[in-house]
Every structure is written in C-alpha cells, then in structure tokens.
C-alpha cells in the first residue's frame, strides 16, 4: 500500500499495469509459519484508517470487476524489470537529466543519492532470528487457482520459505533460504519438483543496516541503506519512506542541509528500521517450529526475543492481533 503514494504522484492512470504484467494484491497468505500446518492471512488494511470488518469483506471478495477503493486496501504485483524503462521515460518527461557514468562516492563536491544496493551496504547484522542469505527465483505458467488469486502466498519450509506471486501472464515463484543448510543445487531441485521451474536467478543478499545513512554529501536509499529480508517487501517501503522523510525534513529545515539535519534524519531512519526488524523477527521468534536444524538454530534466540518483545507504536491493534492469533505464542 505504501507504493500507492509513489504511483499516484508519478502516473496519471494505471496504464502501466498491462505494460508490466501487473496484478492487484489485496492480502498476503502465510502458510507453515507457526507450525507446519498453520495458515494466517494479512489483509492490506490499517485500523488507523479503515473499518476493519468492511475492509475484510471487500478484499476477500475482490476480483477484476470489484477492486476496493480504500487507499490502504491494495498493492500491486509486477515485473519490476519492465517498470524500469517506464520510470526512466517518466523522469525524462519531468525534466530529470539522466547521467550514466561511474561515480566516486568519496567526491564531496556534490550531494549524491546512493542507490548501489548491496554494493553500498555494510553496517550492523539485522538479527540472529533472521538467518536467510540467498534467494532463487523464476517464472512458471499459471497453475491451480493462480489466475484468480489476488494475493501473495508464502510457505515456510524446513529451511526458509517459498513464495508465489501471480502476474497477468505467469507466476513468480522462488525460495528464500540459508545457504548453511542447503546447497544451491538442492534448492533448485526442490523448486523444479514443486513448480517445474527450470530457469533460475540466484540472488545472494546481506541482512544488514547502516546506522548512518545520511551525511552532508550522500543519502543511502533502498538496499544500500538496509535490507531486512525479502519477506513482506520491506525494502520497497523503506525506499518510499526514505524519499518522503528526506523531502519533508528539507522543508522543515528550510532546505538547509547541516549537521543537525543529518543527525535527525539518521535518528528517524534508525527508528523506522528497528520497528520493521521487530515485525520481521516476529515471524521467526513467535513460531514454534523446531523440526529441522534451520529452525533449531532460530529457536536458540526465541526466548530472549519473546521476553523483550514490544510492538512498535505505529502498528495497529489489528496487525498485532493477526500476528499473535496466527502464531501460537501469545503476548503476556
């Protein structure tokens, strides 16, 4: 839903959807997290703005001819590689001068936005509960009910989790896992057996965050600033939040970039990261799974997480309830 802010500012309509094979997304279905047979659903609702009962009625009956209008009730699923050239053309229309060249980030003559992804990411390890480090992805033809699905599905396994993301013309599938417990070939074999996938894209990643993402000369955004893990697409949210925070703070500081600005930006961003880390930790820390070496390693850190657990202030009661109802641990 946070991407609505971005798309509504950039595009006049949703014609880009067909160009990127995009579909609407109204909720996320998480299977196998509390235990191997569990299932929980997170509608894209927010009890700070929505009537939750009305929201659930709308999204669970949503289809192509019945799209909820509420601002926080849907997101999009798309092929991002097809969106890139559309955004480039839109930038040109808006008068942005695109320069393609290698940049020296030690250069202090101009202010630069660091979008280098993992190449620009160092810093603190996210959490001992979040140990995945690799994703393998691909596309397959529609199967079962995926042409009628308006949600993303994840399925926790003995090492990480699968995902299924229906698009207009195919389904994005893949696996996030810890390379300590399976080889690349083993995961590819599982994906082939599960989905018939035979063309693979491997994406190693680092689960880290920078405490200092803004300086007098650079601003890190996206996975150059932080990467929690692919679950719940938090990096997309953080990109939008980074840009919005920077814009609003510039206005508050009368477009003056100084030491005080840098200090407050970094404090705000760090708080945002830590809040979302707690949310992501909950999937692992509140689960009772201990049926494999992967889950046994995570289990070593659950007690500390549960004993010290506090929900971020801005998560609505509905989200808290969905998380605690979906998983077998209940907050004291």
Which positions does each model-derived feature cover?
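Long, low-complexity C-terminal extensions of enzymes
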Residues: 248, 252-332
